[in-house]
Curated annotation (Swiss-Prot):
SMART domains: Molybdop_Fe4S4 (SM00926). This is Periplasmic nitrate reductase. Belongs to the prokaryotic molybdopterin-containing oxidoreductase family. NasA/NapA/NarB subfamily. Gene3D superfamilies: 2.40.40.20, 3.30.200.210, 3.40.50.740, ADC-like domains, Dimethylsulfoxide Reductase, domain 2. Its EC number is 1.9.6.1. GO terms for molecular function: 4 iron, 4 sulfur cluster binding; electron transfer activity; iron ion binding; molybdenum ion binding; molybdopterin cofactor binding; nitrate reductase (cytochrome) activity. Substrate binds at residue 886. It comes from Campylobacter hominis (strain ATCC BAA-381 / DSM 21671 / CCUG 45161 / LMG 19568 / NCTC 13146 / CH001A). It catalyses: 2 Fe(II)-[cytochrome] + nitrate + 2 H(+) = 2 Fe(III)-[cytochrome] + nitrite + H2O.
Length: 920
């Protein structure tokens, strides 16, 4: 056995041992008699592992890693091995459930009872049309997902944006990747990473920033381990975190920092480069860059009214910081370049213009970095009070030296520790700042790399554009040219698409609370479990005059607060595709029939589209006092559309779609052909299929958006022959390193000095100014250039106090996925980790007179929960910080968390709020 095989086998065994279970029998399963094996993709994280699925007699009987998959090379993590068992939980939802009274009529205060698909859609249609009539396109909403298949997300976005003329659709990826997205768009002018997972094997240094890769991306972490063991003296690993985790186990340096001070640490590294090691600056690379900055008085993404009637008195103190705040000592230093000092009051005048920015000179950039000395940064950033300041300084110096070392390749990985941050976009931008200064970006083994959390947060949420402001292929609804392109591909009358951004995910919850949204449809996520400050949103769902639909496979918290639950097919019960964190798109075929009467989300979307005629939605629509959408029915007639045609007819069953004929293959396709279950559909009749290859039609129409624009995807059939391809796919070849002329065909086309072309900013200009603001009307040409931002350190809106002395951080664990609705149904995973725990430093437990396993209350200004403490577990927080995962609905930690967001990305900061702890 060679070293690589040994690592694979021991990593799998370790994963199982850590979960307290035996090694799955199918780990090394060979093909068994009567089993049909087919390639597929893992249901869980953004790594995008390839798996092999075995079926027999209509049921999945085994799952194993796909040895031909380039991402995982035959290895799966502990969740991956149970991809089959998540589908067969005892309480799987198999039929629509509606709240009804004793007469069987819909009643918001009634109890759930089974109903037919027809009854479900009848009530859903009635409630939607009531909300639409009262509030128009802004009165309805869809909570989408980074776990949508690409086709599901595309169909949902098309129905909502083209059909209902609403932009109130936003995915739960807003909670995990929005800061990374805005960072990409701000810096590169185009979304998604420039590198790929092969950078792990090609680099000399892996630095993790707020990324517990050992548990959240375990297969990638096995590759990091492999790389470290291949050259232990040369290859260095550094883990930066607010607490010690399993990712620290192989780290050469572990840096525990105070929450939010990662911004200051990046500025320290940049200062070291600019002031003390100018010879390390890659001047050739900087010819492709422009320096920039923006306002600091941008708030924290909370409600603008601290006196909102739904706030408790305890909440108002924190929320007041959205309007203004008194600067701390640390901020007095970091914001001195603006003429501010500690004790000054900063008015948040640019809260609605947080993304505004302008070009500055290198000299201004250098000036802004001046305060970030080793002494200043160490003083504010040291997170472990039991570590000496000198030890911490030495670690910071060693970290900076690793980045600066001339011939050392380096990759910076991050996930939610960066993104779920009230300055999440800023800290994303800063990672590129350092890599750009050194010229260590977009080349093999070098790069700042955002790791996606969900399996298709890239492929669906971002690339398809299921965000409230986006269209496919990085286009946005506010851009007239982008709307024109979209209307042409979708064959819509000009002016159909709403030009005003919808509400983002947290904004939609607030709109429900305020009565602005009256109808909401949840698909492939669990927002009432997953959204911070959850007490507010549960009350909004149950006590306000609205109608909530949840499409789900198990009864999570969101299903329990809904008015109507629709049973959804799960991953291998339908055709689909995901796009992972390295831009790799992967497709799979339907392996088995859905359980009961469950149907795919694509089917649900298309069937709902049948309920609306063009005349119901394409007439004049008032959005607000300043915007009314035009009546487009007359132009629709000139295009050959009948106003009595349904949205299904025009958007999904037109001649283009019907041109994709069914293919005779050995795999089921419930949407195309119907199936042997003979499910009675939305019209009360047995659903016999659409008669055309809907999944292929959706894909081929969708890929039109990216062709020729740097987002090129291959055709549908190609993906079923390969183990995924990294886009842009040009002339049948994938792209591993973007913006690098040696590897990227789009970069090769551009005339720039050197080896790089950041074509996302092609033909763009930027206002010119200084550190204070825009000066005059001059603009800087940033054609084919990336931006290097300066961003200052700022405190989060809520920090520990005498009354609430602890930081609270939330996150995931290896064995469970998100809110646990799937993985908590797997007996082996449940036995391994049956409940969420509060990880606490033993010194804090001793001070509070608590012992291992004691039950405590964790209480914030917003709510409280009971939980057992663990002082000996996998995570070891520093004194003054506790960590609680959020997979367990019985430890509903999001009742405690704060719904502050990054003002640029609107992504929630789940990583820091202030709490008090006492024995229950």
């Amino acid at each position: 056995m060679n070293r690589r095989d040994f690592i694979k086998s021991t990593a799998a065994a370790a994963a199982c041992a850590s979960a307290g279970i035996a090694l799955p029998a199918n780990l090394n399963a060979e093909e068994n008699h009567g089993w049909r094996w087919d390639k597929a993709v893992c249901r869980f994280c953004g790594t995008g592992c390839g798996i092999m699925v075995a079926t027999k007699n209509g049921k999945i009987v085994a799952v194993k890693g796909d040895p031909e998959a380039p991402v995982n090379r035959g290895l799966n993590c502990i969740k991956g091995y149970f991809n089959a068992k998540i589908m067969y939980g005892d309480d799987r939802i198999t039929e629509p459930l509606l709240r009804v009274n004793s007469k069987g009529e819909f009643d918001k205060h009634g109890k759930f009872a089974p109903v037919s698909w027809k009854k479900a859609f009848d009530v859903m249609e009635k409630e939607f049309k009531k909300a639409y009539k009262e509030k128009g396109p802004t009165g309805i909403a869809v909570f989408g997902s980074g776990q949508y298949t690409i086709q599901e997300g595309y169909a949902a976005a098309k129905l909502v944006k083209a059909g209902f003329r609403s932009n109130n659709i936003d995915p739960n990826a807003r909670h995990c990747m929005a800061s990374a997205v805005v960072g990409f768009m701000q810096v590169f002018g185009i979304d998604e990473p420039s590198g790929c997972f092969d950078d792990i094997e090609l680099t000399d240094t892996i630095v993790t920033w707020g990324a517990n890769m050992a548990e959240m991306h375990p297969i990638l972490w096995s590759r990091v381990n492999d790389r470290k063991l291949s050259a232990p003296e040369k290859v260095k690993v550094v883990n930066l975190s607010t607490f010690s985790s399993r990712t620290s186990s192989i780290a050469d340096i572990e840096i525990i920092f105070r929450p939010s001070t990662d911004v200051a640490i990046w500025n320290y590294i940049a200062r070291e480069i600019v002031y003390n090691h100018p010879e390390a600056i890659d001047t050739e690379f900087l010819k492709n860059c422009e320096f920039a900055t923006g306002p600091v008085d941008i708030g924290y993404g909370m409600r603008n009214n601290p006196n909102h009637p739904k706030f408790s008195e305890a909440e108002k103190d924190t929320v007041s910081h959205q309007v203004s705040k008194k600067l701390s000592q640390a901020e007095g230093v970091s914001l001195a370049y603006l003429g501010l000092k500690a004790g000054d009051t900063l008015e948040m005048k640019n809260a609605k213009k947080a993304g505004k920015h302008w070009a500055i000179s290198f000299e201004e950039f250098k000036k802004a970095l001046a305060p970030y000395t080793l002494d200043y940064v160490a003083e504010i950033a040291k997170g472990d009070e039991n570590e000496s300041i000198e030890q911490f300084k030495e670690k910071l110096q060693n970290l900076a030296n690793l980045y600066i070392e001339k011939n050392r390749k380096i990759v910076s990985f991050w996930t939610m520790g960066f993104n779920q941050h009230t300055r999440g976009t800023w800290v994303n931008e800063q990672s590129y700042m350092v890599h750009f200064l050194l010229g260590k970006q977009a080349s093999p083994g070098n790069g700042a790399f955002s790791l996606t959390g969900q399996p298709s947060a890239c492929g669906t949420a971002r690339e398809v554009g299921t965000f409230c402001h986006r269209l496919p292929a990085d286009m946005v609804v506010a851009n007239p040219k982008h709307r024109e392109i979209t209307e042409k591909i979708w064959k819509l009358p000009a002016g159909t698409i709403n030009p005003k951004n919808g509400s983002h995910f947290v904004g939609l919850m607030r709109d429900l609370e305020d009565g602005k949204v009256k109808f909401a449809w949840v698909q492939v996520n669990n927002p009432w479990h997953n959204t911070a400050n959850a007490n507010h949103w549960i009350k909004a769902a149950r006590e306000m005059d609205n109608f909530i639909v949840v499409s789900d496979c198990y009864p999570g918290i969101s299903a329990k607060v809904a008015d109507l639950i629709l049973p959804s097919a799960m991953i291998y019960e339908k055709w689909g595709a995901y796009g992972n964190a390295e831009r790799r798109t992967q497709h799979w075929r339907q392996q088995v029939l859905p359980v009961g009467d469950a149907m795919s989300d694509t089917w649900q979307i298309l069937e709902f589209a049948k309920r609306f005629k063009l005349k119901d939605v394409w007439g004049e629509q008032k959005i607000d006092d300043k915007l009314t959408l035009p009546n487009v029915l007359e132009e629709a007639k000139t295009m050959g559309y009948d106003e009595n045609a349904t949205l299904f007819d025009i958007l999904f069953a037109n001649d283009y779609y019907k041109g994709f004929k069914p293919e005779k293959i050995k795999f089921d396709n419930s949407e195309v052909n119907g199936d042997t279950r003979n499910v009675k559909g939305s019209d009360g009749e047995v659903f016999k299929g659409y008669g055309f290859f809907i999944q292929k039609a959706l894909w081929e129409e969708y890929r039109k958006f990216g062709l020729g624009h740097g987002h090129d995807l291959a055709d549908f059939d190609t993906y079923h022959k390969v183990r995924g391809l990294k886009w842009p796919v040009v002339d049948g070849k994938e792209t591993s390193w973007r913006f690098n002329k040696k590897y990227d065909p789009y970069a090769k086309k551009e005339e720039t000095s050197g080896d790089f072309a950041f074509y996302g900013n092609k033909n763009k200009k930027l206002d010119k100014g200084d550190l204070i603001g825009i000066k005059g009307e001059d603009k800087v040409d940033i054609n084919n250039k990336a931006k290097i931002f300066f961003r200052p350190y700022m405190d989060p809106p809520e920090i520990p106090s005498e009354e609430y002395p602890f930081w609270l951080c939330t996150g995931r664990v290896l064995e469970h996925w998100h809110s646990g609705t799937m993985t908590m149904r797997v007996p082996e995973l449940y036995r391994a980790v049956p409940e969420a725990l509060c990880y606490m430093n033993p010194l804090d437990a001793e001070k509070l007179k608590l012992s291992q396993g004691d039950t405590i209350w964790i209480e914030s200004r917003r709510g409280k929960v009971k939980v057992k403490i663990d002082t000996r577990g996998r995570n070891i927080p520093p004194v003054g910080l506790v960590y609680v995962p959020w997979f367990d609905e019985n430890v509903f930690i999001n009742k405690v968390t704060l719904d502050a967001t990054c003002p640029l990305s609107s992504e929630t900061d789940y990583k820091k709020c202030a709490v008090k702890i006492y024995k229950a």
